Amino acid sequence: MHLVSSLLVVGAAFQAVLGLPDPLHEKRHSDIIKRSVDSYIQTETPIAQKNLLCNIGASGCRASGAASGVVVASPSKSSPDYWYTWTRDAALVTKLIVDEFTNDYNTTLQNTIQAYAAAQAKLQGVSNPSGSLSNGAGLGEPKFMVDLQQFTGAWGRPQRDGPPLRAIALIGYGKWLVSNGYADTAKSIIWPIVKNDLAYTAQYWNNTGFDLWEEVNSSSFFTIAASHRALVEGSAFAKSVGSSCSACDAIAPQILCFQQSFWSNSGYIISNFVNYRSGKDINSVLTSIHNFDPAAGCDVNTFQPCSDRALANHKVVVDSMRFWGVNSGRTAGKAAAVGRYAEDVYYNGNPWYLATLAAAEQLYDAVYVWKKQGSITVTSTSLAFFKDLVPSVSTGTYSSSSSTYTAIINAVTTYADGFVDIVAQYTPSDGSLAEQFDKDSGAPLSATHLTWSYASFLSAAARRAGIVPPSWGAASANSLPGSCSASTVAGSYATATATSFPANLTPASTTVTPPTQTGCAADHEVLVTFNEKVTTSYGQTVKVVGSIAALGNWAPASGVTLSAKQYSSSNPLWSTTIALPQGTSFKYKYVVVNSDGSVKWENDPDRSYAVGTDCASTATLDDTWR
């Protein structure tokens, strides 16, 4: 026995010298981490669930004064003041609630979702510094007072992720309603709210705005990806309630095409197009988990969590933040505390609970898909990620019967658990989750009881348990057009007035077949393209105005601006596309707006047009200035 023990010690010493992994040590380490995370999740889950609901008005224990259905970012009212409702945060939190509800029916969660829907219907109509509902611009306002009044202070506005994220959250509940026999309720209450947000997304997706961290006015990977998903899922949802979204179908492929431009040849996602940051940002990891579709495999174009690009990016983002004190000794391949981005200076730049949990969640998503498909593919793009965890791995596809497959599954799962274990280490004894924890001491920092932190924990815990959200249709919406186009569609907007849900919306006892739509929907919209040839000078713009709200009710300030992207001296073409309900009759004219704001109208008479009722999806008006 003594001799055998000595040989084992010598063998271990040789492994240490040669840098080879010790399988027994690795298994002990993973078992310890797993038990630690198991215990933390068991303890933290009821705390997180309770504290999340506490931040939702009007009955939440920390939401006194907030309107019904309002998701408060944090009860913190000073240093920092987060006593507001952000459209983005509220949507992400509600999406978590919807996912929990659809997985396990719960009347408390259902009431919370319905109150949220009613609050958002009202909020869409609140005019604010970003604009109003008349042309959709007001939907891009990032935050409001907790009593649903506008916030008029200086802020990074607009932020264009709010509308698509809200649409995604509400579509989740709408799909549950349809699948349980309540399509009429989904159409009368959920669809009008969602329709406004989809119209905003199709109209404004190509305009820059502030990103989810509210600091950079640029195109954002997170916003673009959310916009694509919303239009894809929105089109399918529209059909399920007997409606349609022509703008969704026309614009979604162009957004996905643009999304590919965020991938850097250096092997990571550039989260924002600015020249004063590296672009290595948890923004991209959050994108991957919030656009996770368990039926899409490891699709590259939608940057699914197990795609080679998403995994390569995960490594780069995590590695970029290993310099913090709390990450001392946490070398590549070991879980680390993660923040927003390495250059962050907010509160001097620190790890965030939600960011560290997002790093774990992406890996849990990947493991789920690998197990489902029974194989793992390692490419040259993702090789560095895998080598950190399984040094002997090489490019290739490994089936579930191979030892390499098993080694990867075990290593990635342990790696994911490591991120949760870090969160556990820096969670106070009462289970409260703030926004950040100090990069050196690990002490909680910034806003207390951050609602998004609790949602992030619950989401990561669910994925670890193999509980995943329904598919959003990524597998059938991942094809890229031959060339990218920055096309947009101006939308029509209307206040969602129906906000009272029927009682007893319980799960169906039998499978419900959604209604089959014949012909086109009664509210079918046609994409009407206005082409106007007019010679203009630098600084001038062209608008179309007319007798309907979508054309500004004859007010030039509210008219629709045409694009000059096809303009040339030989073909002075200005153009725009507007989604208009079939059968709509209207009069219209074009105006030239000078740089000083003065307006020149074209000559009489008024032009007139009636949108067809033949279920066509497009129509074109070719006009010349007169």
From Swiss-Prot:
Glycosylation positions in this chain: 106, 206, 217
Enzyme active site: 211 (proton acceptor), 214 (proton donor)
One Gene Ontology term, aspect cellular component: fungal-type vacuole
Signal sequence interval, chain numbering: 1-19
Protein name: Glucoamylase
Residue ranges of the propeptide: 20-35
Organism: Neurospora crassa (strain ATCC 24698 / 74-OR23-1A / CBS 708.71 / DSM 1257 / FGSC 987)
Family of this protein: Belongs to the glycosyl hydrolase 15 family.
Reaction(s) catalysed by this chain's protein: Hydrolysis of terminal (1->4)-linked alpha-D-glucose residues successively from non-reducing ends of the chains with release of beta-D-glucose
Lineage: Eukaryota, Fungi, Dikarya, Ascomycota, Pezizomycotina
Listed EC numbers: 3.2.1.3
Domain CBM20: 520-626
Gene for this chain: gla-1
